[in-house]
Amino acid sequence: MDKYTFTTAQKIYLPFKRLIGILGSIIGIIVCLTFLWWWVFIINCFVTKGHPVFRQERYGKNEKVFKMVKFRSMKLDADPNLAPSEMNEDTQKSMETGFGKFLRITSIDETLQLFNILVGDMAFIGPRPGSAHNEEHLRECRKKYTPNAYMVRPGISGYAQIKMQRSHDPEFKAKWDSEYVKRLGFFFDIGVFGYTILKVFGAAKGR
């Protein structure tokens, strides 16, 4: 596999993207603490019997393992090593709480990842990280591509996710994660971010 080198424009953009992540996550945390998280935390405490927050090991930039944080959307007896997107549809439905389904449809469960962005584990936009305990196939697929997803910070949303269909397929994800790194840039990130917002509102409206 050939070594990939970022373009000059990408090298300039990457520190700027990190600055956006720091400032954006600080603003987001303040807003969420004020208007959102307190009531989600209280409701989820009752629903999950006192376990409202969930942490799971994921692979980040340069394959470094970090703990991604989110509001718990699954029952306590769900497999802690599997992300909901890695479960088959029947298992996901049986393990999902009623309130958890709402959190996932609206993507509110992902908002705690603002803390991951702040500390530098993640970015707003980037390849979506899979669970560290079940990502071997995805890692193999990603490493077949140049560039690959592990060259950049993983994101809350990514290019593979907005492609919608078959986004759970490792080959599909690896291909579009590689394409994201190739096209990495400010306006491309804005486009992915905007499409993500439309997709979230569309999913919530559709339910």
What would you call each of these model-derived segments?
Residues K17, E96, F115:
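Active-site alpha-helix of zinc metalloproteases
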Residues W38, M95, E110:
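Short phosphate-engaging motifs
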Residues Y4-A78, F186-R207:
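A hydrophobic, helix-centered structural microdomain
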Residues V53-M95, I156-K175:
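Short, glycine-rich, amphipathic interfacial segments at transmembrane boundaries or analogous
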Residues D2-T5, L112-R207:
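Hydrophobic structural segments characteristic of membrane proteins
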Residues F99-G100:
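Alpha-helical coiled-coil
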